[in-house]
Swiss-Prot record:
Segments of skewed composition (Acidic residues): 1-15, 294-303, 316-331, 639-648, 660-672, 680-696
Biased composition annotated in UniProt, kind: Low complexity: 105-116, 158-186
One of the protein's GO biological processes: xanthophore differentiation
Protein name: RNA polymerase-associated protein LEO1
Biased composition (Polar residues): 36-46, 117-126
Transmembrane segments: none
Positions of region (Disordered): 1-336, 526-560, 584-696
Complexes and interactors: Component of the PAF1 complex, which at least consists of cdc73, paf1, leo1, ctr9 and rtf1. The PAF1 complex interacts with PHF5A. Interacts with ctr9.
Taxonomic path: Eukaryota, Metazoa, Chordata, Craniata, Vertebrata
Biased composition (Basic and acidic residues): 60-69, 127-142, 199-262, 526-539, 649-659
CC terms in the record's Gene Ontology section: Cdc73/Paf1 complex; nucleus
Name of one Pfam family that matches: Leo1
Function as written in the Swiss-Prot or TrEMBL entry: Component of the PAF1 complex (PAF1C) which has multiple functions during transcription by RNA polymerase II. PAF1C associates with RNA polymerase II, is involved in transcriptional elongation and in histone modifications including methylation on histone H3 'Lys-4' (H3K4me3). PAF1C seems to be required for multiple steps in cardiac formation. Involved in heart development and required for differentiation of the atrioventricular boundary. Required for neural crest cell development.
């Protein structure tokens, strides 16, 4: 590596070079616009190179404003000095200006590549070490030397001087003293960015011009010394393009957001010291973008590994579940060896499946005349499937038996046979009946023939054909039986039967009997009410003071006092005996007789009433007065004797005449009187006539 003095020079040289670079940059800034305009119109390749390099410069970090434009004083001085000093540099044309700009862009792209890598590592994107500037400037100087040697535009002595001058100018432009103009330059760049209201194509062109103006600081410092020598050439342009493409691959990784981020960081880090910037930038070799950020696969794998298990998340099959679940062992097979003899039967050549109709049946047991029982008409016969069979006698039952032939061999006989005709049809002859037989193949589920062996079944054959039977003609007995059975079946289904009316309706007869009973009850009620009215009339006709006594004649439990009281009343009142006779008529003796006796007594009472009102009423009254006068003291005595002795008994009859003196003569004679025999003395004898006869 070259010596530090050769690379950077002394401080005096750096100051002079700063002035020259400032003037050069000012002059170049004045002439930048016409040259860039000529490049846009004259050379598309130069414009594309600038656009390409400007994009690289925008993606990478930007150097300080002092490196770009220099001091304000230098800009003013350079603008005044540019007209006189570099007036001859305008004749270079678009090709030389394009080459010079490409050189400046090349240095900018190197800076931008290093800045973009440092921005990914979160270091300061705008601060570069002096060593890095010197290395980049030395490299560019060597390239310039090689180009000058090839073209011969400058002398051997001038090329290192110009290279040193460019290095010194670059070093001077990168010094911390030039950082004071960064706010103004950023403001200018901020004005230039939003001031492009054009399409994308136009914007890219204008960005290229603005990029030339921004990033022309390094190139302008070189141009200030190299304009006199006119060292630019086509080879330099090609090399700068190659270097720009190589640097673009590194700087393209930065985004617009990183550019904004680096611009904001520049303001904060502008006040930092050079020692801090040197310590930060001398960190060693810069890592690549993949080393900084890693790949997407690494991020996903690390996040999956560090992710904790959620409480409800089930464990994977590899997380130890193998030991928890033991392998299921297969169940041991149970084999039982059973020896069953094989039964082979002679089934014949053809095997048919038959569903017997209801007019055919088979007797499985051999026929024996000794145990044969004929079928009865009144019994219902059901087959093994529960269907009702027609009650045909011998004609519809297939029977068989075993017998010996003449030679003594056992032969099986049957009452049925199947005849196969020449056309292939078959007929069943059962006794005198003939049935047509039809064959049909079995489709779907096939029926199998089994032989029962103990509790199991042993298969013998599979049925593939079935037979159906039909009566041959309608004149057969089977057909007649079938039609009759159908008629009976239809008649049984009738729910309502009409019966002839053989007698009277029991309901109407019952209603008539009820009506008769009600009439009889009403007649009896009318009769009783009529009798009651007749009695009431009789009571009202003979009502007097004697009937007003309370139940004197109705109660048997009353003592003899009532009788004596009545006798006392009859003593002072006339007609007492008549009332006693009237009382006898309605006495309880009438209850003991029959209905005819009651009717006779009632008629007698009526006659007595009529007689009392007649002619003999006065005579009877006189006789009664005499008898009552003669028998009054006897009545008192008798009543006294009955009270003292207590042997005078009444027989429960309501008799008011009778034997008062105890001589047995109790006749109360009179015309039209009914004599009642009364035993008053208790001897049980009474000669009075109580037979209901009238004494004339």
């Amino acid at each position: 590596m070259a010596d530090m003095d050769e690379l950077f020079g002394s401080d005096g040289d750096s100051d002079n070079e700063q002035r020259d670079s400032g003037s050069g940059s000012g002059s170049d800034s004045d002439h930048e616009r016409p040259r860039s305009a000529s490049n846009a119109s004259g050379s598309e390749s130069a414009q594309s190179d600038r656009d390409h390099d400007d994009d690289e410069d925008e993606d990478g970090g930007k150097p300080s404003n002092k490196e770009l434009f220099g001091d304000d004083s230098e800009d003013e001085h350079g603008s005044q000095h540019s007209g006189s000093q570099h007036s001859g540099s305008r004749h270079s044309g678009s090709r030389h200006s394009g080459s010079r700009h490409s050189g400046s862009r090349h240095s900018g792209s190197q800076h931008s590549g290093s800045q973009s890598e440092r921005s990914g590592n979160q270091s300061d994107a705008t601060m570069h070490s002096d060593n890095e500037h010197s290395m980049s400037e030395a490299h560019r100087g060597e390239q310039d030397d090689e180009d000058d040697d090839d073209r011969g535009h400058r002398s051997d002595v001038g090329s290192p001087a110009s290279g040193a001058g460019s290095r010194r100018s670059d070093r001077g432009s990168g010094s911390p003293g030039s950082e004071a103009g960064s706010p103004r330059s950023e403001a200018g760049s901020g004005h230039s960015d939003p001031g492009t209201p054009h399409t994308d194509g136009e914007g890219s062109g204008k960005d290229a011009h603005s990029g030339d103006e921004k990033w022309g600081g390094d190139g302008k410092s070189d141009q200030s010394e190299d304009e006199d020598k006119q060292q630019n050439s086509d080879d330099e342009r090609e090399r700068s393009d190659e270097e720009g493409e190589r640097q673009k691959s590194e700087s393209i990784k930065g985004s617009d957001s990183e550019d904004d981020f680096t611009r904001k960081k520049k303001k904060k880090i502008a006040s930092d010291s050079d020692s801090d910037s040197d310590a930060e930038t001398q960190g060693g070799k810069k890592p690549a973008a993949n080393d900084l950020f890693g790949e997407a696969d690494d991020i996903s794998s690390d996040s999956d590994a560090e992710k904790p298990l959620t409480p409800g998340q089930p464990l994977d099959a590899d997380d130890g579940m193998e030991g928890d679940q033991p392998e299921e062992e297969p169940a041991p097979e149970t084999r039982i060896e059973v020896e069953i003899p094989k039964v082979s039967t002679d089934l014949g050549s053809d095997l048919y499946f038959v569903k017997l109709p209801n007019f055919l049946s088979v007797e499985p047991r051999p026929f024996d005349p000794q145990y044969y029982e004929d079928e009865f008409e009144d019994e219902e016969m059901l087959d093994e499937e529960g269907r009702t069979r027609l009650k045909l006698k011998v004609e519809n039952t297939i029977r068989w038996r075993s017998r010996r032939d003449e030679e003594g061999n056992e032969v099986k006989e049957s009452n049925a046979r199947i005849v196969k005709w020449s056309d292939g049809s078959m007929s069943l002859h059962l006794g005198n009946e003939v049935f047509d037989v039809y064959k049909a193949p079995l489709q779907g589920d096939h029926n199998h023939l089994f032989i029962r062996q103990g509790t199991g079944l042993q298969g013998q054959a599979v049925f593939k054909t079935k037979l159906t039977f039909r009566p041959h003609s309608t004149d057969s007995a089977t057909h007649r039986k079938m039609t009759l059975s159908l008629a009976d079946r239809c008649s049984k289904t009738q729910k309502i039967r009409i019966l002839p009316m053989a007698g009277r309706d029991p309901e109407s007869q019952r209603n008539e009997m009820i009506k008769k009973e009600e009439e009889r009850l009403r007649a009896s009620i009318r009769r009783e009410s009529q009798q009651r009215r007749m009695r009431e009339k009789q009571h009202q006709r003979g009502l007097n003071a004697g009937y007003l006594e309370p139940d004197r004649y109705d109660e048997d439990e009353e003592g003899e006092e009532s009788i004596s009281l009545a006798a006392i009343k009859s003593k002072y009142k006339g007609g007492g005996g008549l009332r006693e006779e009237r009382a006898r008529i309605y006495s309880s003796d009438s209850d003991e007789g029959s209905d005819e006796d009651k009717a006779q007594r009632l008629m007698k009472a009526k006659r007595l009433d009529s007689d009392e009102e007649g002619e003999n009423s006065g005579k009877r009254k006189a006789e009664e007065d005499e008898e009552s006068a003669s028998k009054k003291p006897k009545k008192y005595v008798i009543s006294d004797e009955e009270d003292e002795d207590g042997d005078g008994e009444r027989d429960g009859d309501r008799e008011r005449g009778g034997d008062m003196d105890g001589d047995g003569d109790g006749d109360m004679e009179g015309d039209g009187d009914v004599d009642r025999d009364g035993d008053m003395d208790g001897d049980g004898e009474g000669d009075g006539e109580g037979d209901g006869e009238e004494d004339e």
